[in-house]
A protein has these predicted regions:
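Structural alpha/beta surface segment adjacent to cysteine/selenocysteine redox centers
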Residues: 1-86, 160-163, 171, 180-183
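C-terminal cap of thioredoxin/glutaredoxin-like
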Residues: 6-10, 83-183
């Protein structure tokens, strides 16, 4: 959801956005997490490996479109079969189906981990995704739903960047009251 919001802000503010990979599988590999969460991590790692690998092999410009193609199928689409999700995402982007092999390859794990740890090093280990960095200001979040548009997208952006730029600002949170809204 945050990526949709950042897209909206980038379009209205002419931001130069560099998309990176933050892997929940890497983040949680040595942590005690619930069995349900642990069961998802191998599939999550496959997606992260695919995106990181194609960022290396095809180029960084594929990261965001691939992230969107995968994410749209997984989240609002509810698809759970990684093989189908990956094949459909590659087809949507006009990429060779053989590139799916990278989902199961550790060939570019160094790039995946470097991207992951670049983000985590900016905000700390006790966060998740998304991580947003604006110049020297970085933060976890926001966790939002639905993604704001128009002036509200800009208002939220300005407020969050302003709050996060205060050196002593660490956390602002409230409980979620709804499931993600993709429309």
């Amino acid at each position: 959801m945050a990526s949709r919001w950042v897209d909206e802000v980038a379009e209205r503010r002419d931001l130069d956005v560099t998309w990176r990979i933050m892997s929940l599988a890497v983040l949680n590999e040595d942590k005690d997490v619930s069995d349900d969460h642990r069961a998802f991590l191998p599939r999550s790692l496959r997606y992260a490996r695919l995106v990181a690998s194609l960022g290396e092999v095809v180029g960084a410009e594929v990261i965001k479109p691939l992230y969107d193609a995968l994410g749209t199928r997984i989240h609002p689409g509810g698809q759970k079969d990684a093989e189908e999700v990956i094949a459909a995402a590659l087809a949507e982007l006009g990429l060779d189906a053989a590139l799916a092999r990278y989902a199961d390859s550790d060939e570019h794990d160094a790039a995946l981990r470097a991207s992951h740890f670049d983000g985590i090093s900016r905000v700390g280990q006790d966060v998740g995704t998304p991580i947003i960095a604006v110049n020297d200001v970085a933060f976890f979040g926001p966790v939002i739903s639905p993604a704001p548009t128009g002036e509200m997208a800009l208002t939220l952006w300005d407020g969050i960047v302003a709050a996060a730029s205060y050196d002593g600002f660490f956390e602002l949170k409230r409980s979620r009251t709804r499931e993600p809204q993709f429309d």
